[in-house]
């Protein structure tokens, strides 16, 4: 076997690429770097490789401009709470699941901050109130019932509900100024909401990982093929873009955290569990303003309610973002379509993913999701005037001259067979693994980055079953993520968990509210 030894500008040491390593991580985004950070703590002697096809880490979905930066905790995202017509109730199961998963991320980041692994939490996470805002009596009734149901759980204590326009205007003056006085509105206000710069977290974690002599990251290295080798190792074929040659690495474990490209790479591995899976690529655009007079009037992430039968991605929101210590406002998203599976991918990505196993599921999912097809068509034909009119519902006094359009990231939604063997479109994220778990990938989209630690813990259990329950890993995991041992919903009512939540937020310099707030503020 011919060796290829060279020094990459992002590496601290020379390394023999045609060799055996403990784990290969594909993609240098928030997911791979989070898993790599856990493994460096749990198994510091393990040799870890990250391969990234671009010339810089965190430039796809983790890039600060390619996502909305919402710390998804189900405070304001109405699509995480469904109305049940049968018994006139609100199902908060998914909201609780998302919130508890986000708590794990906060605990991990607090551990990293406390131990000096990452610095200055204000550089990557800040309190920005999360607000749900609706109009129309039906939506107001829904929001009120949602608030009352969420208040039965202490994870949502601190939230305030109001139908008083004056109170709401004090929270979001930009949204309320110039609005029709006869329009009935309602809002919930959660001061514990956050804005997160996932690119900054990724960059800081990588800087720490590079200090480990057993860790190497190779930029401009495109993983093109994965196959089983001697029933023991995975053979990874990597295209060295800069030197225009292919090298091979043999590894015991593989995690594919390559965003939209994860599906294509899983298909090359020829594992049974990916049969029938397909991807539906959807891009996003946002209107942006830097105008300080406008930005100063808005200090919140305001989420509305999607129209009936519309997909979750259609939920409009106007957000404060803090990027490089500078505030900007974003409004959107506006959907785009491209056959690329990555923002910097190939137009052939979608076509390369098609095969005899997933063509039928794709067609079936398309037939069953006509509202999505209609939504995308309407989005694609939108003019800038149409987009400004959409923004006007959340900023009545908008001036189009203050806003410009940016292209955000590319997401690939999951299409797979259900228990009736029919193709369905699935929103969210999912781990797909080989039979023994040694090869695993993350498919899907939101709320991925916000719950990256919860996903990582699931990966540890799937990929390293022989180590996950041993005493050494247990001890370390409890130190890293204190609620790991028993992260059940009921446990969050305990004094122990309340103290963990309080300590976590103190370390991250975030607001913590323990007291329940059942007060409803109505229009006088």
From Swiss-Prot:
It catalyses: (S)-malate + a quinone = a quinol + oxaloacetate. The keyword Flavoprotein applies. It is an enzyme of class 1 (oxidoreductase). GO terms for biological process: tricarboxylic acid cycle. It holds the Pfam family Mqo. GO terms for molecular function: 2-hydroxyglutarate dehydrogenase activity; L-malate dehydrogenase (quinone) activity. It comes from Blochmanniella floridana. Pathway: Carbohydrate metabolism; tricarboxylic acid cycle; oxaloacetate from (S)-malate (quinone route): step 1/1. This is Probable malate:quinone oxidoreductase.
